[in-house]
Amino acid sequence: MKIKRILNHNAIVVKDQNEEKILLGAGIAFNKKKNDIVDPSKIEKTFIRKDTPDYKQFEEILETLPEDHIQISEQIISHAEKELNIKINERIHVAFSDHLSFAIERLSNGMVIKNPLLNEIKVLYPKEFQIGLWARALIKDKLGIHIPDDEIGNIAMHIHTARNNAGDMTQTLDITTMIRDIIEIIEIQLSINIVEDTISYERLVTHLRFAIQHIKAGESIYELDAEMIDIIKEKFKDAFLCALSIGTFVKKEYGFEFPEKELCYIAMHIQRFYQRSVAR
């Protein structure tokens, strides 16, 4: 394979059997120039180059971002694929590299990164969050920069989105933000404080994610007969009224509708928090 274009010391474009490829590898372009032969032992990652905006953006990132940021980003992606035992959506190489480099730049300049969805992310995406913790140690070792938990949450979101082959983070953010909004409604309407580091909190967040994903997919997940629905409405009156408020809010803000039986299950989760708050 001959080098067609050098993007940086660790990235080149080659032509191989009528296909253009982007090759990544530490020092793959060191002391090389156009038309030189590629050293196969230097190749760490190969991408078939396609004439799409994603690949044009990828090349632009490889040419413009700091090379150590790109190397760290690729190490994190490789670690994620190994830990999750999957092949991650290739779009992550653009979005994540760009995000991580900007985050490192902000932290280097003493700026504070805040993530209002951090607690939900820890519960919803625990494996991805562990990968973020691994990334923190790597970045500290390579750059001497400490990555706060808030940014680890952002890393986890990128990994989760790419893991599920989503085109962007919109759906992941929508679900996580919706859950954060629901929890705030419960706290405000019932005048209670939901402690995040508890089993009940984890159950509620996990249940909401599961329900939202299945309802969005048009799948029925629970069966409750009319008698049981009436019992829940009567026995857990305040909790059910809170669930109704949640349903109204979510429909208005997200265009998403919880069926009545799902609101009953949400009411049962709410009741746990409400009972504990009243008992104190």
UniProtKB/Swiss-Prot annotation:
Phosphorylated by HPr (PtsH). Also phosphorylated by SacX on His-99, leading to its inactivation. The keyword Membrane does not apply. Pfam families: CAT_RBD, PRD. Residues 64-169, 170-280 form the PRD domain. The modification Phosphohistidine is found at residues 99, 207, 269. It comes from the Bacteria. Residues 1-55 are annotated as: RNA-binding. PROSITE patterns: PRD_1, PRD_2. Keywords: Activator, Phosphoprotein, Repeat, RNA-binding, Transcription, Transcription regulation. InterPro entries: BglG_antiterminators, CAT_RNA-bd_dom, CAT_RNA-bd_dom_sf, PRD, PRD_sf, Transcrpt_antitermin_CS. GO terms for molecular function: RNA binding. One of its GO terms (biological process) is positive regulation of DNA-templated transcription. The keyword DNA repair does not apply. In the presence of sucrose, SacY is activated and prevents premature termination of transcription by binding to a RNA-antiterminator (RAT) sequence (partially overlapping with the terminator sequence) located upstream of the sacB gene. Formation of the SacY-RAT complex prevents alternative formation of the terminator, allowing transcription of the sacB gene. In the absence of sucrose, inhibition of SacY activity by SacX leads to termination of transcription. Belongs to the transcriptional antiterminator BglG family. PANTHER family: CRYPTIC BETA-GLUCOSIDE BGL OPERON ANTITERMINATOR. This is Levansucrase and sucrase synthesis operon antiterminator. The lineage of its organism: Bacteria, Bacillati, Bacillota, Bacilli, Bacillales. The gene is sacY.
